[in-house]
């Protein structure tokens, strides 16, 4: 009996993207009406929800926020996350074993699906 490898969904992969801290963003970026990466104004068709993110407010209380990005910025953000991840990941450093890493596979999938 062989073990089945579970591959991350696109939503799982999007959650791997590194989002700037809310205090470094404009009000429009924090509100989801502008891309968190570039500041591009977002439309319903061009926006990608990046999933809930946890942070703290100025009083230290935990809060969630819901960043969004322009779909054209996803490949660049995925590549940046992959460059941060890959040096410390043995499967990602060897072309023969690239697909053995779920994180690396998910980030490469994002780059393909949103190019």
Mark where each language-model region is.
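Short, intrinsically disordered terminal segments enriched in charged and Pro/Gly residues
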Residues: 1-29, 87-115
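Short recognition patches in nucleic-acid-associated and regulatory proteins
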Residues: 30-64
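Disulfide-bonded cysteine-rich modules in secreted/extracellular proteins
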Residues: 35, 79-89
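Short Cys/His-rich metal-coordination motifs, predominantly Zn2+-binding knuckles/fingers
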Residues: 38-40, 73, 92, 104
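Short, non-ligating residues that shape and space the ligands of small metal-coordination modules
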Residues: 43-47, 79, 98, 110
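Zinc-coordinating Cys/His ligand positions in small cysteine/histidine-rich zinc-finger domains
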Residues: 64-73
